[in-house]
Amino acid sequence: MMKALLLEVEKFVNNLLSKKLHSNYLYHNLGHTQRVVEKTKEISENLGLTLIDAENLEIAAWFHDTGFTESDENHEEKSVKIAVEFLKSHKFAEDRIQIVADLILVTKMNAVPKTNLEEILKDADAAHLASKDFFKFNSLLRKEWELVLGKKYTNKEWIALNLSFFTQKHRYYTDFTLKNWSKDKEKNLSKILKNQKKLKKDNKKFKQKEEALNLKKNKSIVPERGVETMFRVALRNHITLSDIADTKANIL
């Protein structure tokens, strides 16, 4: 029976996100949800969860970003509302509905997981940080924020934002992810630092070229002014000599 419900959940969410999610959500789309579901299963299987716990997690993973179909603001709460309505209509146990709701809410940016299940979903939702495709996903998120939130970042600002998230705001929680994903996350962090270093170097080169061009421009202006001055002096001298010649002629 539970397998049938999981299939219904998958079908419902696939249909909802395919039809109602705005195309501006380039990162938080059906593909992201499917990846989170797969990563949730991967962690669950490696940690040996009970069937019920694994099912609760999978349901929460499917529903965790459905709220984006209504609004970006407080989308986790909206996701809970959508999940609760669906699960109640399918006679899902009340205590399990509450667990699913709590799991969805832990995917909020600054939420701290309190249970093992919450740690698993929190880690699965951030699996992209350790992905070989991190920079592709990161680029999609940047464009999504620009389209949905109107937030535009310079390369310098975007790199700084990512460094802050990697080093200060994010951590993996489960034993499985700490053991298996930390190294790949560090690799991506190292690449971000390299990008920052390259950006600084490129900016320095650009500034030096700009200064060199300005210097060259200033040097080219000076001779022109010098020539103008020379012609003015020559003209003045010519006029003076002419005046002298005229004066002498008059005297004679």
Language model features by range: what are they?
Residues 4, 21-51, 63, 92, ...:
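Divalent metal-dependent phosphate-bond-processing catalytic cores, especially two-metal-ion Mg2+/Mn2+ enzymes
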Residues 36, 52-70, 75, 79, ...:
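His-Asp-centered metal-binding catalytic motifs of divalent-metal-dependent phosphohydrolases/nucleases
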Residues 216-236:
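Short, charged/polar, low-complexity loop and linker segments
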Residues 14, 18, 37-41, 84:
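Amphipathic, well-packed alpha-helical segments that form the structural scaffold of globular domains
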Residues 34, 232, 236-239, 243:
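Generic structural signal for well-ordered, non-transmembrane alpha-helical segments
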Residues 76, 84-110, 116:
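Glycine- and acidic-residue-rich phosphate-binding/metal-coordinating active-site segment common to enzymes
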Residues 2-19, 221:
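Short alpha-helical hairpin
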Residues 240-252:
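Alpha-helical transmembrane segments and their immediate juxtamembrane boundary regions
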